[in-house]
Amino acid sequence: MAHHLLLAYSTTDGHTRHICERLQFVMTALGQRVTLVPIEQADALNLNQFERIVIGASIRYGHHQPQVAQFIARHQAVLQSRPSAFFSVNIVARKSDKNRPDNNPYLLKFLRQISWQPQLLGVFAGKLNYPS
């Protein structure tokens, strides 16, 4: 039986959602059952039904959206009790000295603000939208 994976995301301009949709496509192709939801809707789910949980969050003006840390705080016990991952999407990750979990300032700052310790961390370069 396939593991059931939750992909919860917080996005500002849709790029993090796009990354999660791609992850969903790949994981489904590998035989995984995947539920993809905005983090605002994840509270309505019974998180105990998921064997694995991944949270993706974008940076806007130097910060992840507050609902990300709030969701993590509310569900800390469940997140800590199973394989879990977190990734940050931010524009500075395009630079080689800021494109890894151990050197991305936004991810490192966020991890200091929460007590959850995901087993897997990731950083993706964000999309910069220029006004037309």
What residue ranges belong to the model's regions?
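Short amphipathic alpha-helix with an adjacent loop that forms part of the alpha/beta core around
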Residues: A42-Q49
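Glycine-rich NAD(P) Rossmann-fold beta1-alpha1 loop
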Residues: T11-H18
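Short, contiguous strand/loop micro-motifs
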Residues: S10-T11, I59
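FMN-binding flavodoxin-like domain, especially the glycine-rich phosphate-binding loop
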Residues: A2-H4, H18, V26-L30, T35, ...
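Short loop/edge segments at beta-strand edges and connector loops
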Residues: P38
